[in-house]
């Protein structure tokens, strides 16, 4: 039969060089010639489909995003209801379950029709032929300039070969399943599962109604012309409804009326009438959006780096399990919106946002105090400093708040990992820990706090403009004094601190050279660093001086579910000695203790233990010149349970364009970044056990 059909095509196309030659040697020879170069039909076994890469949180349950070139979800035969199979064969290939991969009568009719008309080629393609055309023909055969009748002949031959290679019921099931996963349904929907989701919001094919299944089955014939969204109009309820006279509905109705000729489905008259009367209500176009978007984009970069440049993230069908803690992420986004967005809205809108975020009256006081302070953005990182796992990551105060976008607020830009900001006094612990590690200073050392010209015309002062004379290093750090910090850098040396910063994993904007060029000003945080890096560095202080590189990807599986990457233990680097780390920590935790630092502790102390106990935390704020950048960084004591989270949190607030806030009395870190940081850490740790910082055996204690 194949030979006869090819002969018909040969007869119609005599005149082309190929088929004139074929006619000379006979139809059988033409079939043999046309079969040359066709792929092995058993390639169906290895057929893969472009599938999106799915990104999940650390539990594998919360989908953060999907990277895709085509919207597709691959299904098995068992997932496809008989109704969908019947609607599909009714629309595309009524004899599918019995034919040899082609429909002889349809092909002969198409050839006759094309011979008697000067119009375009009539269709006669079965489901098997459509699958062959899409995936099992050489590229040159389906090229736009290829002879369409030669292509049709090769398609017919290959469809016959495919059916022979996969005989019987099982073979038909494989072929129709591949077809249903491959075929284009319009509107960026590839495969029946994606089509059900895009048009009707249905994720489980068994939930499709009879009318919905029929409409979907009718789309592949002409996805553009039959796209329901082209014809949909909103009704009084705001629903997208496709009129009954629209082409996709007319085709749906034709399929419904012919469903009873299919294999399994037999509609009663009442069922048919109900299906014909069912309005086509579309789900509405859903823009592709991510949860934790800045984090998810960073994950994409890391996955590409892990798998190599040859891996296609958009089509590879990978599943990525990340380090993200969804609860922590939600809290980070909540408090950034409350502290950086709400104060810049009009009063009614601000109050509405705070209500939706369920912000209590106590926190509303400091939030409302930020109104008019001209601070429009913020970024936050929370990580487990023992594993390097990034738990929460927000590169702006609201990725999707394009309605508020301005020079001062760029919602899409990632200020946590791509951007860099001046840390101000939050940098000082890096300088002092270097001094402790090299034994240039101890917490009991004295440094002179008096106005000094350190360079031509540069005589920095403390924020309060006071001079205290000789001060203990401990007090100089706790009260964030600038002049003693500069003297500390003098003792250690900029090169030594730059070396130490590299061990802490800190990347300066402009590189090491920028820090050295800053000279002694580098002691007070004038060189920009990434919040992600500085958060990790603070975590190293809590981890006995050992910095574990941040990571975001825990596991990658391929499209078959096989694990192809499992994150190794985080790379650990000794940044400072355990003794130096503890000395720094011991001083910084005083910032959260009222007896040691009543000013800073008012903003930073957290009392959320089981009975309201004080929670040991080491923290430091930072305010850059002119209050352009505000920061708070800190870390909790490591829990005794090695599997429990050891938390470090970093926060930046400011404006995207690096502009100084236009305010007569600008906010400082203690009134803006510190309370926001405090609220996040307070809420996140509410159910965590209390842990304390342990002193190394080599460290003694003396009163000075």
Regions found by a protein language model. Give the residues of each.
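Conserved catalytic neighborhood of penicillin-recognizing serine enzymes
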Residues: 113-141, 288-289, 386, 418-420, ...
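N-terminal type II signal-anchor transmembrane helix
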Residues: 1-55, 95, 293, 343
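Glycine-rich, acidic and aromatic/proline-enriched surface loops and short helix-turn segments
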Residues: 129-140, 181-188, 205, 210-225, ...
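Non-catalytic, structured segments within soluble enzyme domains
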Residues: 119-334, 502-503, 507-509, 515, ...
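Flexible, acidic/glycine-enriched loop-and-adjacent beta/alpha segments
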Residues: 76-128, 190-200, 208-213
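Active-site loop and adjoining helix of the penicillin-binding protein/serine DD-peptidase-beta-lactamase fold
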Residues: 155, 159, 163-171, 222-251, ...
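A penicillin-recognizing enzyme superfamily signal
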Residues: 322-384, 389-395, 400-419, 427, ...
